[in-house]
């Protein structure tokens, strides 16, 4: 006999999807130490833990756009183990290693850049870091050979790394074009970490499928994105203290992060307004490497709500739009016959409570009910 679950006192939704989650660390407070001091095996354990915790929070599918701490393919082993039922956890779509250049946002040896000998040792561990068209063509082929679902590139600098900035292009045009052409020849989509509008526009012209962050967006670029059917995963959470300016909280950040948030705050605020008002295809992703634990995906809902995005657009992004970005729209993203029974329920008011997605009351993945956990930081 079928089990009856009474959810009449909750709001029922499809299982949520986080389209930008780096799964390979235990605690955001110690992420830099984990980069350098934990083994690939330990990082794979972190991925398992993250997958279990995200499922318990109502996010039945997550997208991993490259390892922050890891250099290997543990995320693919975890993905396959979940699919085979050996372990429980959110469904994973993964690009195990992002492609990047020396000194770029993806070059985690920057932390040792004042000790070149040690920095070079760490740099050489990141096998998807290199230079030249031929290197990156082969890197794309290797990622696909080992099981990557899509390709991720670090096209510009970022906020969290010490010796680059969001306005820098960090691969040359030939490298960028070669990556996209090769991935498309092999039937894979490409997404890029990118901030500045000139680089967004260049990537669009080269044939990019999607872009992450895009936080310095302008209206001209937004229209190009629409015209070329490119998706954007804007990841609001990492920039909240700058967008909703909070100088006290900014002062608690690490030095290089703090300096960039202050420097770019006006541009981040302007970009947020463009993103909020544009008609681009927006996905829901968190990228919480410096603000909250990676599995607390509900914080992005709070960020969207407090930016005036509206509940329906936010939930649409976290379900149907994300299912399309992950190329799983025939299986997840809506509740309808023929799709997986991925279901979540929420007792807080999704229309008015910005913390609603941090307090999951029920979760089912592929017809199996799992225990839920609410956000560790919620007090009520």
How should these model regions be labeled?
Residues 48-74, 88-98, 148-161, 189, ...:
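Divalent metal-dependent hydrolysis catalytic cores, especially in the metallo-beta-lactamase
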Residues 77, 131-232, 248-249, 261-282, ...:
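Histidine/acidic residue-rich metal-binding segments in metalloenzymes
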Residues 10-84, 102-106, 174, 203-206:
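Metal-associated gating/positioning segment near the N- to mid-region
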Residues 23-43, 102-124, 158-172, 228-267:
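Active-site gating loops and adjacent loop-to-helix segments of metal-dependent hydrolytic enzymes
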Residues 22-27, 68-73, 100-101, 109-110, ...:
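Active-site environment of divalent metal-dependent phosphoester hydrolases
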